[in-house]
Amino acid sequence: MEEYILEIFNSREELCAKYKIDNIKILRLDDEGAKTKLALIKTKNFNLKFIFMYYDMGLKPQLINFFKRNFIILGIQSKIIRIDLENNVIDTLVDFSIIPFFEFLENDSYLIAIFEMGISVINEDGELKWKLELPEILIDWEIVDENIKLFYFDGKIGIHSLKTGELLS
């Protein structure tokens, strides 16, 4: 499978000027406005796959290549999106509505999506294992064995099982 790259543009004009694209189909996650950006997904050889328009919350989207399977995972806005590259099918795995996506973490078994006040775990088949809205804003996190340790803004610490999402302490 080819490696896919994510590139961010401030406007349609900026995108079209760089890549000389005229008629582009844009998948809209939000209406076009002052704070929208464009996320272009392509191969290293510029085989254009998808362009998303999204509301810029100030956090950069992140793309994960699932080399074992023929799909990629995009964390953008408050969503986790799975893109099936064989069939060009896009599925939203997680949508926390207004809770911003921060980053992905990976271990041998799972892809963990960290949000401002949420967490979700995706298995190696690209399926959502579990998701959890959290009671407080996250300020830090780390994987410890088969668990994830979450540090909250209010000073509390929680440890959850990556396998089940169960709160262990």
Predicted region positions:
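Repeated scaffold domains used in trafficking and secretory/extracellular systems
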Residues: E2-D30, I51-R69, D95-D108, L134-N147
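Acidic, small-residue rich beta-repeat scaffolds with periodic aromatic anchors
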Residues: I5, I143-S169
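Aromatic (tryptophan-biased) beta-strands that constitute blades/sheets of beta-rich domains
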Residues: L40-M57, V89-P100, E127-L134, L168-S169
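A glycine-rich, hydrophobic loop/mini-helix early in the fold
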Residues: K44-I90
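Short loop/turn segments that connect beta-strands within the blades of beta-propeller domains
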Residues: K68, I76-S78, E86, N107, ...
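Conserved beta-propeller blade signature
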Residues: I72-I73, Y110-I112, K149
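WD40 beta-propeller blade core
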Residues: I81, S120-V121, G158
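Short loop/turn segments that connect beta-strands within beta-propeller blades
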Residues: L85-N88, N123-E127, L162-T164
